[in-house]
Amino acid sequence: MPILQRASHHELRSAFRALLASERCYHTASVFDPMSARIAADLDFEVGILGGSVASLQVLGAPDFALITLSEFVEQAARIGRVARLPVIADADHGYGNALNVMRTVVELERAGVAALTIEDTLLPAQFGRKSTDLISIEEGVGKILAALEARVDPELSIIARTHAGVLEVDEVIRRTRAYEAAGADGICLVGVKDFAHLEQIAAGLKVPLMLVTYGNPELRDNQRLARLGVRIVVNGHAAYFAAIKATYDCLREQRGAQPCDLNATELTHKYTMPEDYILWAKEFMEVRE
């Protein structure tokens, strides 16, 4: 397909559902603007993802503390949606509020052209006196998934329920994933899976496709084994975005006649977003516990 030729949003959603229905495991391209989306499609990636953390960096220059608003996130998704030739998953965080806010989130992101979106059960934004890793109840999580399904117009839009396997006992992860599957989620997204033994416990009995956020975990690199366990989508992280930060810094530094710098992309991101300040403010003003 020529670079400037676009597919319809419905066609891209159908293409994403075909990935979920396949027996393969696909790795996402991190897309954060129209250019990165075009590059990913031209390099024959089957699917892209707009991460909430990356959107916060790109739009606000801020770390991932649930600071970006729905309208800001949707605007960035729409810019990508105008040119996308591959299905794009939107990391919709907690749906930007309660179940009614989730409905609004689905309406806006569907209109922006995303092929799928994830709704997570993390308690966001961080609440006064609570742990930053706290989750909402299963009942509230189910309500959000039901609300998302009610709000979508195009039945090809995939609603994926996301939970954090790294902060819960495995029995609780199983309860949550089963509940979200029963509510009608088109897929389950898991964060924090430690290894294949952990994944096998969670995946046993699940019929919906799985999406895995691994951040490059070396314990989860066997694509064929992942596929056999029902994993269809893997998010390794957002290396392309951080490489762009590093390249920009190095290029501008060279233009100023400075010597090469040995700061890596992670260190540069910390330097210019100052996450330590946000952590300090959360503790000082909200008594948030890590």
UniProtKB/Swiss-Prot annotation:
Q: Which residues bind Mg(2+)?
A: 91
Cofactor remark: Binds 1 Mg(2+) ion per subunit.
State the source organism's domain of life: Bacteria
EC number(s) per entry: 4.1.1.112
One GO biological process term is:
oxaloacetate metabolic process
- Where does this protein hold substrate? 53, 162, 238
Which reaction is recorded as catalysed by this protein?
oxaloacetate + H(+) = pyruvate + CO2
Broadest EC class assigned to this enzyme: lyase
> Which metal ions or organic cofactors does this protein require, according to UniProt?
Mg(2+)
The protein's GO terms of the molecular function aspect are:
magnesium ion binding; methylisocitrate lyase activity; oxaloacetate decarboxylase activity
Q: Does the keyword Magnesium apply?
A: yes
Q: How does it assemble?
A: Homotetramer; dimer of dimers.
Family per similarity comment: Belongs to the isocitrate lyase/PEP mutase superfamily. Oxaloacetate decarboxylase family.
General function of this protein: Catalyzes the decarboxylation of oxaloacetate into pyruvate. Seems to play a role in maintaining cellular concentrations of bicarbonate and pyruvate.
HAMAP family to which the protein is assigned, alphabetical: OadC
Specify the protein name: Oxaloacetate decarboxylase
Q: Which organism is it from?
A: Ectopseudomonas mendocina (strain ymp) (Pseudomonas mendocina)
